[in-house]
Structure formats: structure tokens, C-alpha cells
From Swiss-Prot:
It is an enzyme of class 5 (isomerase). One of its GO terms (biological process) is mitotic spindle organization. Belongs to the PTPA-type PPIase family. It comes from the Eukaryota. The keyword Repeat does not apply. This is Serine/threonine-protein phosphatase 2A activator 2. It holds the Pfam family PTPA. It comes from Candida albicans (strain SC5314 / ATCC MYA-2876). Signal peptide: none annotated. GO terms for cellular component: cytoplasm; nucleus; protein phosphatase type 2A complex.
């Protein structure tokens, strides 16, 4: 089998319609759902079947973590992303194939492309659910290569994905990464989706913890290291508001969607709902999927053309942050806004009051 460098192929609503429900779409979705199912009732510290691939992936992520220390961010009065992230990203990009070669001897360039895209965009200094999806695609490529089996799924989520999340939180805090295409208060999290999807499965069989438990700050903080859902809530609580003598603002104020979801009857309903929401808000959204890459392992659906310009050349997706636009304004990328982390840290520095940032 010959391997190729993945490229972006989804540029129009027509392309997107061919993607949704395609064999590759189903492969990606099925993999995510299988990963979710594997951690049903499992906490982050639950035992799982160890394997060489889990160990190799963990070592790979540790190398990424170590790169952050080589490129410390400098103090800045700006509330936007810190440019030192570009140095980190460049260093990672140059080393990615070397790192991946320790995991697989085939399709190194192809799998590396997804791995590199897992850490954000160096031009915009941002990160979002599309980058998170690339990390899943990186793992899926290894599955397609036979490096990963279903026996590894628990370890992939409980060890590898949680380690990836930990590094991403570090990157978000260190470089003040901006949220890519954030829905603001009407989203789950400025950056992530999958920890909610996996986390709901973790809690779906819990005998005592209810969805409304996310409003108990002490409980959330206590269990934030054990359950991904609570880690996300704890993270949001810490960055969305700055406590003062009046106390901090409620989840209802800065994250109304999460507040609404907490009214669900049980975690199993949330588990099911997260999959449905992921299909619509991530896999079914053009602003996200126009960044998705297809190669020999994750094949482009039939009927999606190779888009060319009037001279017959392939479209240059780098005209705007690595993708083409369906309109002339480029507002699919969202308005450039500071991250909640940047706003929160700036306010702490300025010793100001209790102000929410979305």
C-alpha cells in the first residue's frame, strides 16, 4: 500500500454533504463511540490493560510536554495568544516524524500530519475542537495500521487522551491560546468537546453522582482528577470568573449550555446527547470540517472534487489560516478574541474585580 500526505478537500456545503454519512465519516464516528464505550463507569485512575503502544504513545506525549519548557512564554500586556507558541509549534513540527518513527515504521509522514495538527494553529495561535479531532485521527491512523486494537481503547482514553488533555491545558495556560471558532457562552468549553463526551460515559453508571453535581464547586474540584467531565467544569470555573468578596458568578451565567445539560435526568442521557451533539457541532460543521485532512488511511469520500482555481491549479488553502472560505469575510474563523485564560490572568495582574469572560 502506498501512503500519501493528507490534504484538505472539504470546501463547500456540497462537499460537506458528501462527507456526512460517508464510509470515512462512519469510521471516525464509530471509533469515537467505541472509545467512549470503553470507559463506561471507569475513572481516570481505573486499571486498564497495558500494552506497548500505550507506553509508546505516553512517551511520545512526554516529549511534547518537554518541548514546552524549551520555549517559555514571556510576560506581555497583550491579552491575545503569545507568539512563543510559534517557536514551540515549529520545534514540534520539525521533530514530529522522528518521534512518530518510534511508533510506526510505515505511513510516518501521513500520521505525522494529523499529529502536528493536534496542537493548534501557529498562525492564529489558537486551538479548538477541530485540532482535538486531529488527535483522534492520529490514533485512528495507528489503528488502521494495526498498531492499535480494541484491547487498547481503555488505555487510549484513560492514559493517552488524559495525558494529551493535560498537555493541552498547559499549552493553553502558557501561551494563552485563543479559542478557535468558540461559541462563547453557548458552547461547552472554549477549547474541547471530547472530554465531555468521554466524561459523561465515565459517570453514566455512578451510583451517587448526578448531573446537577457540577454545581457543587467543592465536589467538582475534589473529583476533577478522577473524571474528565469534572476536570472541564473545574477548569471553566477557574478561568471564567475571578472570585472576590462577593463570590464568583454561577455556571448559569458564563456557561448556560452546561447549566442546561445539568438538568438531564441522568448521565446516560448526557452520554447519548454528547454523541448526537458531536455529530452536529463538529463532524457536521463546515468551519471545522474544511480543515479535515484526507489521505490513504482516512480516504476522501467519493464525489468530492479536487478544487482548482481558474488556471487549473489546486486551491491554495493557506490563503487564510490553512483553509478556503465559503464567503469573502472569513468569519468562519470567528472574531479574534482573547482566551478566557488571557483575560483572567490579565485581570489578576491588574487586581480588578469579578468580571466574566466568555
Amino acid at each position: 500500500m502506498s501512503y500519501i500526505t493528507p490534504t484538505k478537500r472539504i470546501f463547500t456545503p456540497e462537499d460537506l454533504s458528501k462527507w456526512v454519512g460517508s464510509p470515512t465519516y462512519n469510521t471516525v464516528l464509530d471509533f469515537i463511540v467505541e472509545l467512549q464505550s470503553s470507559v463506561t463507569g471507569k475513572s481516570n485512575d481505573s486499571s486498564y490493560e497495558t500494552s506497548s503502544i500505550i507506553d509508546k504513545l505516553s512517551k511520545l506525549l512526554s516529549k511534547v510536554d518537554n518541548l514546552i519548557t524549551l520555549h517559555p512564554a514571556h510576560d506581555s500586556v497583550s491579552r491575545f495568544g503569545k507568539i512563543e507558541f510559534r517557536d514551540f509549534y515549529s520545534d514540534l513540527s520539525s521533530k514530529a516524524e522522528e518521534y512518530i518513527s518510534e511508533i510506526t515504521a510505515t505511513a510516518i509522514q501521513e500520521t505525522s500530519a494529523y499529529f502536528i495538527e493536534s496542537w493548534g494553529n501557529s498562525t492564529r495561535i489558537d486551538y479548538g475542537s477541530g485540532h482535538e479531532l486531529n488527535f483522534i485521527c492520529f490514533l485512528l491512523c495507528l489503528k488502521e495500521l494495526g498498531q492499535i486494537t480494541s484491547a487498547d481503547y481503555e488505555g487510549l482514553v484513560l492514559k493517552v487522551f488524559t495525558q494529551y488533555m493535560s498537555i493541552m491545558r498547559k499549552l493553553q495556560k502558557e501561551y494563552w491560546l485563543e479559542p478557535a471558532g468558540s461559541h462563547g457562552v453557548w458552547g461547552l468549553d472554549d477549547y474541547h468537546f471530547l472530554p465531555f463526551l468521554f466524561g459523561a460515559a465515565q459517570l453514566s453508571t455512578h451510583p451517587h453522582m448526578k448531573p446537577k453535581s457540577i454545581h457543587n464547586d467543592e465536589l467538582v474540584e475534589m473529583y476533577s482528577t478522577k473524571y474528565m467531565y469534572f476536570e472541564c467544569i473545574n477548569f471553566i470555573n477557574k478561568i471564567k470568573t475571578i472570585p472576590n468578596h462577593q463570590g464568583k458568578l454561577s455556571l448559569r451565567w458564563h456557561s448556560p449550555m452546561l447549566d442546561d445539560i445539568s438538568a438531564a435526568k441522568n448521565w446516560d442521557k448526557i452520554r447519548e446527547g454528547m454523541v448526537k451533539m458531536y455529530k452536529v457541532e463538529v463532524l457536521g460543521k463546515l468551519p471545522i470540517m474544511q480543515h479535515f485532512m484526507f489521505g490513504s488511511l482516512l480516504k476522501c469520500p467519493e464525489g468530492i472534487p479536487e478544487h482548482t482555481d481558474e488556471n487549473g491549479h489546486g486551491e491554495n488553502p493557506e490563503d487564510h489560516c490553512g483553509h478556503a472560505h465559503v464567503n469573502t469575510w472569513g468569519d468562519c474563523c470567528g472574531i479574534k478574541i482573547p482566551s478566557g485564560i488571557a483575560a483572567s490572568e490579565s485581570l489578576k495582574h491588574e487586581r480588578k474585580g469579578n468580571i466574566p469572560f466568555d
